[in-house]
Amino acid sequence: MELGCWTQLGLTFLQLLLISSLPREYTVINEACPGAEWNIMCRECCEYDQIECVCPGKKEVVGYTIPCCRNEENECDSCLIHPGCTIFENCKSCRNGSWGGTLDDFYVKGFYCAECRAGWYGGDCMRCGQVLRAPKGQILLESYPLNAHCEWTIHAKPGFVIQLRFVMLSLEFDYMCQYDYVEVRDGDNRDGQIIKRVCGNERPAPIQSTGSSLHVLFHSDGSKNFDGFHAIFEEITACSSSPCFHDGTCVLDKAGSYKCACLAGYTGQRCENLLEERNCSDPGGPVNGYQKITGGPGLINGRHAKIGTVVSFFCNNSYVLSGNEKRTCQQNGEWSGKQPICIKACREPKISDLVRRRVLPIQVQSRETPLHQLYSAAFSKQKLQSAPTKKPALPFGDLPMGYQHLHTQLQYECISPFYRRLGSSRRTCLRTGKWSGQAPSCIPICGKIENVTAPKTQGLRWPWQAAIYRRTSGVHDGSLHKGAWFLVCSGALVNERTVVVAAHCVTDLGKVTMIKTADLKVILGKFYRDDDRDEKTTQSLRISAIILHPNYDPILLDADIAILKLLDKARISTRVQPICLAASRDLSTSFQESHITVAGWNVLADVRSPGFKNDTLRSGVVSVVDSLLCEEQHEDHGIPVSVTDNMFCASQDPTAPSDICTAETGGIAAVSFPGRASPEPRWHLMGLVSWSYDKTCSHRLSTAFTKVLPFKDWIERNMK
C-alpha cells in the first residue's frame, strides 16, 4: 500500500514538472480529460475549480477555471498547483477567462494582462528591462511588484558618454539601500564599477559614465512596493559644456577628454590666457643649401617672420638634407624643430632582387704617393711626433632613407649560389655624390652540374632540359581527349625567360605557320616521362612569344631553330638552371672530335605500357659523323638527304653506355668543357635533334641535329 502511494505521488510530481515544460499546443491525447489542453496534467478529470479575482488596475471581477480530479479517496483535487489571483498582480487592465462554468486554457497560455504599466511587458506584465541604443531616451518603471528584478543597458556612440538624470524616484527607503533600489554601474554589465545606488524619494545629482555604456539595475524585495522611478538619459561629450574661452575650438581625443584649439594670440588649456604678439628671427639657410618661405604670412622687413610662417630647406647638388625639412614660427617666438644641415652623401644605387647589399663600417681610406715619402724623409722623427696627424672626422648627422655618407662602402653578393655576380663587388661613395665602380647584377650560372663526366650520364636530371607541350585540338591516337596536353619536344633553357627549341616543334608540319602560344607551354624541372611524378618540383610556364629564325626551311629543315620567350621568369634552383652557349673559339678540340651528350624524353612512349610510370629523362653519348658520309649513308638506304652547314650528323657512340634513341626523342645535344667565365667544366648547348629516318633505333642511320654555333649571335640578341 505504501509503495503504491509513493508511486502515485511520484507520478503526480512528474506531471507537475511536465506542465512548465509543455509547448503552447499539446499533441498528447488523453480521452479522459475534458479538453486536449489538460490531458498531460491529470489522470481522469471529472470536475473544475473556479478562481475568482479582482483586477488591481480597474477593479473589475475577473477569473479563470482549472480542472479538478478525484483522487483514490474520491476527494476532488486540483490538477495543478496554481497561484490564484497573484497572476493579475502587476496588470493595469486584465484579461478574463471563461470562468462562468466552462473549462478553458486561460491559465496555461499565460496571457493574463490586457495592458501593462509603463516599463513592464509580457503576458503577466512581470518582464522589464532592455538594451537601449539612442542619443537620448527614458527609463520609466510605473509601480512594481514584490521580488522584481530589471536590467537596462544604455549604449552611446564611440567618443560619447552617457548622462542619466532622475525625474521621479519613489522606492522603499533604507539608509543602506538594501531592500528596493536602483543601482547604476559604469560599463555594460553587472561587473562594472558602481557609480551610484539610490532608494527612497530623494533624487540624486546627474550621473555620468566614463565610457560609452551604462548599466542600470532595479531590485525589489519581498515586502512593500511604491510608485517606481523615471529617469532620462542622453549622449554628451566633454565639449558639450563649451569649455574653451575666446572662441577656441573644443576637440575630443580618443580617451573622451578634450583639448582646446586656440585662436592666434591665446593660449592655455582652455584658451584663457592672452599672448603678446611675437615674431621669429630669420633662421637662415644651411651651409651648402638654401631656404624658401612656403607658407604663412611671411617675413617682416625681410628679417623677422610672423607667427605661422613656414620655411622649407633645400640642399645643393651632391648634398642631402639632414634634419627637419620644414620649420614653423610658433606663438612663443621660436621655430619648431631644429635647424637642418646639408651633408655630402650619395643616393643608394638601385639593385635587383637577386643582389644582396651590405653596408660596411665607415673607414676613411688613405693613399701614399711619392710625395708622401718625400715629406716623410725630409722631416725628422722628432718633429713628426711633436705634430701628430689628426684622424679625419667621421660623417655626422642622420640621412634620409636611401642615402649613404661620404666614403661609405657597399658590398654586394648574389642571394643564391646558383647565380654569379657581374659588376663591382664593392662600391664607395665619392665626393661627387656618385658611386665608384659599376652597378652589380646577378645572372644564373650556366651549365653547371657537380661531379658529372660525359660517359656516365644515365639517370641524370639535366636542369636546363625543357619539356615542350602542345594542346590537342581533337582526338589523338584515341588516347587523348580534346584540349589535353601532350609532350612534343625538348628544348634548352638559356636564361630565365628564354628557351631554345627546334623550329619544327612549334610550327605546323611542312609550314612556317607558328602554333598559337596559348596552345604551347614549357615545363621545367621535369625528370619522369609521366606528368604526375614530378608535380612538386616542376614549373609550368606560359609562352609570351615565338621567334622563328628567318632562314628556317620547313622542307629541308635548314636553320631548324626557334626561341620561346616565357611570360614569367623561371625560378632558378637545383632542378632548374640554364645551359651555356658556346662559340667556335671556345672548343678545345675540333667539333668532329667532340663527344656530345644527347638528352630527351621518349615522345612516342605509350602511356598504357607497364613501364611508362617509371620512364625518365634519357641520355647517351653520340659521335659526330662526317656530313658527306651521312648523306651517302642515307643514299644507301634509298633516302636522299641534304646536310647543310647549319646541321651535323651524329650516331651513338658504341663505347659509351646509353639508354636513348634519338629517332624517338626530340632532345638537345650538349658538350662539357671549361668556359671563359670559369675554369671549371661547363655544359654548352651544341645542337637540337632535327630529323632522323631510323625507325627502329638500330643506329644504322645517323640522326641530324641543328648546329647551334652558327646561331649564337642571333640567340643572344633575342635573349635580352
UniProtKB/Swiss-Prot annotation:
Similarity annotation: Belongs to the peptidase S1 family.
Listed CDD domains: CCP, CUB, EGF_CA, Tryp_SPc
Keywords from the named record: Disulfide bond, EGF-like domain, Glycoprotein, Repeat, Secreted, Serine protease homolog, Signal, Sushi
Disulfide cysteine pairs (residue numbers): 128-150, 177-199, 239-250, 244-260, 262-271, 280-329, 315-342, 414-442, 489-505, 630-649, 661-697
Residue ranges occupied by any Peptidase S1 domain in the UniProt entry: 445-720
Domain CUB: 128-236
Listed name of the protein: Inactive serine protease PAMR1
Known glycosylation sites: 451, 614
Any one cellular-component term (Gene Ontology): extracellular region
Ranges of residues in domain Sushi: 278-344, 387-444
Signal peptide from the UniProt entry: 1-21
InterPro entries: CUB_dom (IPR000859), EGF-like_Ca-bd_dom (IPR001881), EGF-like_dom (IPR000742), Peptidase_S1_PA (IPR009003), Peptidase_S1_PA_chymotrypsin (IPR043504), Peptidase_S1A (IPR001314), Serine_Protease_S1-Domain (IPR051659), Sperma_CUB_dom_sf (IPR035914)
GO molecular function, one term: calcium ion binding
Limits of the EGF-like domain: 235-272
Source organism of the structure: Pongo abelii
Location(s), subcellular: Secreted
Electron transport found in the keyword field: no
SMART domains: CCP, CUB, EGF, EGF_CA, Tryp_SPc
Function: May play a role in regeneration of skeletal muscle.
